Amino acid sequence: MHRAARPTVKSRATAAPSTAATWAVIALFVAARVFMLLAQPWASEDAYITFRYAWHLAHGNGLVFNPGEWVMGFTSPLWTLWCALGITLGAAPETWAQWTSLLFGAWALHTAMQQLARHASRTSAVAFGLAYALWPLFSALTASGLEMEFLFAGMVIAGTQVHARGRGAGVALGLLALTRPEGTVAALVLACFADRRARLVGGAIVALGAGLLAWAYGSPLPHSVLAKRTLYGTPGPWVGRHWLDWLLPLPMLTHTAAREGAHLARLGWLWLPAAVLGVPAGFRLRATPVAWIALAGLTVWAGYAALGVAYFWWYSMIPVVTLFWLAALGLSRLPRWATRWPVLAAAALILALSWLDLFPVYLGRAQNEFRTFHPIADALRSRARPSDLVMAEPIGLIGFVTMLPILDESGLVSPETLQRRKLGDGWYTDLVARRQPRWLVIRPAVLATGEAFAGRGRPFRDDAGRLAILRDYHSVWPVAPAQSDALWLMERRP
């Protein structure tokens, strides 16, 4: 059987970037990642949720957060299994996740530069390589222990394999779909350009994975995703404008949810024109993986904005990397004299200087999590019995360090919490009365104001519910008064 011929669209380049340029960019990539890893050896709070699932699997308890409770509170099946492999091999999950993320990122970078040089231009390849190597967000994601670089590597590898009509195309598509929900969307986009065999193989892998997840958890959809949708909703594009408005270099109109968007908005005069030029450049290359990968990223980005997905800083990986991808394509549209080393050198300087502003943001965020959550975890571990139930938020680092049974007040791993929060106010009072946890990990601001830290529904119906917690529980840590955003460890009175 003859394969259908793909439409022929001429590429502007047919050679890989020079070996010296490639290795120079990879050296910058490694240097930036290693610098961040040495400064921030601990992982992000949410990564520890995955690590606890992986730890239980590696120790024979199944892919669970609490032994015996089959709730899919992780977002990435494939990354969770990967972390379980590292634990089985004797590695600390933080070390395994961070340093293998670096390797996956380097693989993605090398492959992306090869494809951009082959189908767009060498300038595009080097420009994207510099952005991916030097923009601080990406180094922070490597250090986070989350699966975002793994996801991007999957997109690049799958797009490349689909274009090559390789035997690994279907496997790459199937595995990409199992990285995260965004990976499923990206895999569907890339599958539109795949041959029949790749679609069948990829579909079979997804069907097998979804079937196993449905068998174990009752649904192939992550419960964590359902919990976030319930707590934060999908309010639509106006509320979701924090995914788009940082494209404009107009700070007075910017509704950014965090420092990432504010910093990008200030540089919009540089990124936006290049990215706008990148759209027609991508259309010209529509028969190449360069365009397909861009389309996959744009689809995920548009989905975030259209649904009004709540902002979590690691979600910004795909929108920002897609912006840089399009900007790199746009550089190939500029006159030759404007795309040589002076422009790339200026871009590299801007990227490097961004560390002065953004490195303290990411390091401070990680330090704040660790210094706030770890002392609570140590205090709880030293006082609690193995069977003691803890009602807590956050649950990642505290849950991983203590390995105690957790009742999650956000509902990520506790369906009963989610069901009760759907009913409205008083959910905290009712859950404490029903489950009688010995320990509470709670923010003092919640007790002081009666307002939930996140999501729908007030925790107490009235002041009596709030006072009942203070009557039935007493604070055991910290000894000194805490700040409003700190945590209290409270024990049920005898």
Show the residue positions of the predicted features.
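Transmembrane alpha-helix segments characteristic
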Residues: 23-30, 126-128, 132, 203-211, ...
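Hydrophobic, aromatic-rich transmembrane alpha-helices
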Residues: 27, 110-112, 187-194, 256-301, ...
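Membrane-lumen/periplasm interface segments of multi-pass, membrane-embedded glycan/lipid transferases
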Residues: 52, 59-75, 218-280, 310-313, ...
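Transmembrane-helix motifs of polytopic, lipid-linked glycan transferases
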Residues: 99-120, 124, 157
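Specific aromatic-rich, kink-prone transmembrane helix
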Residues: 109-114, 131, 150-169, 189-191, ...
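Membrane-interface alpha helices of multi-pass inner-membrane proteins
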Residues: 128-136, 156-158, 167-181, 187-192, ...
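Hydrophobic/aromatic-rich transmembrane helices and adjacent perimembrane loops
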Residues: 179-181, 185, 269, 309-335
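Membrane-embedded, lumen/periplasm-facing catalytic core of multi-pass transferases
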Residues: 346-399, 405-445, 467-494
